[in-house]
């Protein structure tokens, strides 16, 4: 397969997808915003910063030059974190074919791997796909693909059996993405429910942070255990469905699919989960002491050393809950913890006793 595939974002997930595609015979070029990461991929065939334990195929290379990465690519995956995604796309738009919106040049298919929301001018969460459709040439209206599912990058790179959903309002685009991604170890299913899949992908990270808090509290309290975790998981799924309905999701089966309960389960329970880790470290490392409030935490989130997307999503979902009068006890309670208005133990006890105030 000689078609070039570009991946914008050389974090653990973008690199893992590149690894899988490379093993499947594709030529892949990663865009990294740091030269050190690109150099390690090109010289050692390892992403030393974000995926250091996994050797990459020689068909995978990297560059900090956006034009070089995207030139002649037939397929582009966007994998930058939600905080930085629009900046990366603005850079992408400077180069052909995106710099010539004449409808004549062939446009590559674009799929989004990023999980999260992008706020509007009022701070309410917007779907990533909606924001990108406004930024990209008109051709991409209803033609973007959103990819999600229970898929930690470490296991995808190891070739462990994984399932993903490729959602698009254009069935042919989702099918093309499915055919490019799937392999013996990567099962990919098509979906038309691009709204529901995006809600699940973003909101489950908030639940996972709360799950990490509970995980840490089980060590210091004898009233929490495996049963408690399942109780929180079920409450989290219910909350995600509430968010989905408020944001226009119309396919309830999405929430019980691999992109719904499947992704929620692995994000909460897996040892690889950054959101669970962050929630745990709120208790075990008193990590919030280094920040004044939630806004300060988001502004200086690089200081943590890893990116828990649930922290950012929590802020936007709390705004959504307040403006639309939604009962989101996990999101709203976690917001108060991150903003230093509530003690972690109080949140968990309130949730598990059915107090949604």
Curated annotation (Swiss-Prot):
It is found in: Cytoplasm. It catalyses: sn-glycerol 3-phosphate + NAD(+) = dihydroxyacetone phosphate + NADH + H(+); sn-glycerol 3-phosphate + NADP(+) = dihydroxyacetone phosphate + NADPH + H(+). GO terms for cellular component: cytosol. Pathway: Membrane lipid metabolism; glycerophospholipid metabolism. One of its GO terms (biological process) is glycerol-3-phosphate catabolic process. Its EC number is 1.1.1.94. Gene3D superfamilies: N-(1-d-carboxylethyl)-l-norvaline Dehydrogenase, domain 2, NAD(P)-binding Rossmann-like Domain. The active site is at 204 (proton acceptor). NADPH binds at residues 12-13, 33, 115, 153, 274, 307, 309. Signal peptide: none annotated. InterPro entries: 6-PGluconate_DH-like_C_sf, 6PGD_dom2, G3P_DH_NAD-dep, G3P_DH_NAD-dep_C, G3P_DH_NAD-dep_N, NAD(P)-bd_dom_sf. GO terms for molecular function: glycerol-3-phosphate dehydrogenase [NAD(P)+] activity; NAD binding. PROSITE patterns: NAD_G3PDH. NCBIfam families: PRK00094.1-2 (NF000940), PRK00094.1-4 (NF000942), PRK00094.2-3 (NF000945). HAMAP family: NAD_Glyc3P_dehydrog (MF_00394). This is Glycerol-3-phosphate dehydrogenase [NAD(P)+]. It comes from Treponema denticola (strain ATCC 35405 / DSM 14222 / CIP 103919 / JCM 8153 / KCTC 15104).
